Amino acid sequence: MTFLKEYVIVSGASGFIGKHLLEALKKSGISVVAITRDVIKNNSNALANVRWCSWDNIELLVEELSIDSALIGIIHLATEYGHKTSSLINIEDANVIKPLKLLDLAIKYRADIFLNTDSFFAKKDFNYQHMRPYIITKRHFDEIGHYYANMHDISFVNMRLEHVYGPGDGENKFIPYIIDCLNKKQSCVKCTTGEQIRDFIFVDDVVNAYLTILENRKEVPSYTEYQVGTGAGVSLKDFLVYLQNTMMPGSSSIFEFGAIEQRDNEIMFSVANNKNLKAMGWKPNFDYKKGIEELLKRL
């Protein structure tokens, strides 16, 4: 492949958001170094202007590209939630050590911007105890990014995502699981009360948020956070009922709300304050109803 003069690094490029982001970057004509655990598998599905590499090879590749190409930014999507491991070392490595390696590369090769991906349940005003190691490590790296932004000529951006959904998400995720239950015509799905308010954000809008910040990187402060969501909340119950009614009009509800006890310190309300993101020229194109309809079209 022929690389353009400017490129970005994307970690977690083979994941849910990463795949959508790569397609959008391709359409924008931006070259990408895409970090993945399985280079051979992803090279077989190569996109134009995308060069796949492993975490072990990223430094050598960036050094090679520095001869005639400029690194303009890094988008860090890769993460470890801790669902499949109880090892704090593994979680710390994925959420702090590896992105710090990328941040050092960004400083060394004078990238303009580092976009870090974070989650709504790690907001500082929440005391969410579920996935605590994930939350601790994400907050740790955010502090490191803030420190680096004060010490170096780079913008560090914390992209705090609300509840992202869309085509291509993992089968074990909440919404794909519910869709699978509906497809299998299960008679009962046990839920909590469903009173939690969430800001469901369609993956296309999330990708556009990253592109908007990347395109306007010269206007971004040295450190800032953008909350990526529609700015409007809906209860889990209303979201699930609309999903079922759209998939199976006229069917009886399969949801048994209140059958599962709420977690301690459950987050009952999370909606993005997206004013500063909108000020950069971004706006969501999908409310939750349009998002559900678009998701079902693309399954």
Curated annotation (Swiss-Prot):
Reaction(s) catalysed by this chain's protein: CDP-alpha-D-abequose + NADP(+) = CDP-4-dehydro-3,6-dideoxy-alpha-D-glucose + NADPH + H(+)
InterPro entries: Epimerase_deHydtase, Lipid_A_modif_metabolic_enz, NAD(P)-bd_dom_sf
Active-site residues, as the UniProt record annotates them: Y134
GO MF terms held by the record: oxidoreductase activity
UniProt binding sites for substrate: T117
Family designation: Belongs to the NAD(P)-dependent epimerase/dehydratase family.
Record's protein name: CDP-abequose synthase
Gene name tied to this protein: rfbJ
